């Protein structure tokens, strides 16, 4: 094999390793985001079950599992995840299937249009840019 061929082989191998690393990191980040979204969604229902009212602010989530985890309050206060405060949810999560409880607002993935949400039935899914824009309009 020529010197040029060896160099190209090494460059290709390094590129493959770099791509694999980035993909693995993105997968880890996605799983972390999904974990937080699900726990926040669960905390909305947990708060409702404790005092009979839907939470309307971060303080209303006190004593829920999510806020007992380290650094979670700060993440909410800094807007890493945005809770869509709603007072007209059904206590049965399945009835809230089309509603968004919380979404990822500050990850690198969300900045590139991969926005993850927790639906009212606690499903985690990506939403389209159009859905995200509509959600932001309703929040204002």
Where on the chain are the PLM-derived regions?
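N-terminal Sec-pathway targeting helices
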Residues: 1-19
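Sequence-pattern detector for short linear motifs
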Residues: 7-9, 51, 117
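Conserved hydrophobic/amphipathic alpha-helical signal-anchor segments
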Residues: 15-83, 87-90, 123-140
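Small-molecule pocket liners
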Residues: 44, 98, 114-116
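Surface-exposed, charged secondary-structure patches
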Residues: 80-106
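Short, solvent-exposed coil/turn segments at beta-strand boundaries
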Residues: 95-99, 118-123
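Active-site and glycan-interaction determinants of carbohydrate-active enzymes
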Residues: 104-107, 111-119
